[in-house]
Every structure is written in structure tokens, then in C-alpha cells.
Amino acid sequence: KNILHVGVFKKNDERTIYNMVYKDGKTGTAYIKRFASGGVTRDKEYDLTKGTKGSKILYFTANPNGEAEVINVALKPMSKLRKLTFDQDFAEIGIKGRGSQGNILTKYAIKKITLKSKGVSTLAGRKIWYDPIVKRLNENGHGRYLGEFQAEDKILCVFNDGSYELS
């Protein structure tokens, strides 16, 4: 019930970065954090919040290439609040461990969080090699080094028969 994310876990995947906003059950303070999940144990539950009763995840995304989006946070109207909406860029938040508390986003009650814009990767490019023996591209360092590629980069492969392929 109430599943936020389902995905295939890749061992030693350091590029998948999770962005999250949660409300602490005890204080009501909203925290923002970015984290990578290096390893997991099967059939074990991990608490991504502080662990206090009543804590709730308000926003969650999984980014396979470390993208950092910009969110718009709308606060519930209160008498002393002047600014009811503000933007927060996940690129300004450091990538920490899964068990970290995170940074304080706001101490006020949040009405809703919406995605303003999808960001670009905050990680370095992937290093790609071509292995002529198996005729494949790889990230393991086997074969001839082609270069470092970003998420939006494409590789043009031209074959002997004149055909080509973008990958």
C-alpha cells in the first residue's frame, strides 16, 4: 500500500540519486535531502525520514543520471507569512547518505509541492570504451577509450555496409 517508487536495484549504482522532501512527525518541520543508495539488504525496511511517528514523505523522485529538478513549494496561509510560494533547486542541496536528516526546507505547513522544471545531471559524464573483440560499448574499461559522455550525448556508429546507428 501507498508505494511511492518501484525500480530494479543495480548493485554499486552510484549514479541514481533520489530527491526527497518530507515532514517530520514530531515538529512538523519540512526537510529536503538528496541521497544515493549504495546497497540494500533484501526484506529489510529503511526509514528515509527521521523515524518519528507521523513523519510523511511529501515529494520523492528517483533520477538515474543524478538530475536535480526545481520544485515550487506552496505554503498554507498563516497570519505572519508574507511569501506563500517559493522555488527550491535540488542542485543547491548536497548529496548525502540515505540515513541523513537533510536540510530544513521550511518550518511552516506545506500545502503542495509541484515540479517546476526538470534539471540536468549534476554528476560527471560516463566514461565509455569500445571493445573490438565483442564489438560492444562498455563502462568497465575494456578496449579503446572513446571519451566521457553526458546524458544527452549520442554516439554515432557507422558500419561497413554504409548503415549507421545512434546510441
What are these regions, as identified by a protein language model?
Residues 1-167:
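C-terminal interaction appendages of subunits in large macromolecular complexes
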